[in-house]
Amino acid sequence: FLPPCAYKGTC
């Protein structure tokens, strides 16, 4: 499971 920022690539 990846945090929401990982989906948009804005971590």
Swiss-Prot record:
Disulfide bonds join C5-C11. The keyword Secreted applies. It is found in: Secreted. The keyword Disulfide bond applies. Expressed by the skin glands. Keywords: Amphibian defense peptide, Disulfide bond, Secreted. Induces mouse splenocyte proliferation through binding to CCK-BR. This is Riparin-1.2. The lineage of its organism: Eukaryota, Metazoa, Chordata, Craniata, Vertebrata.
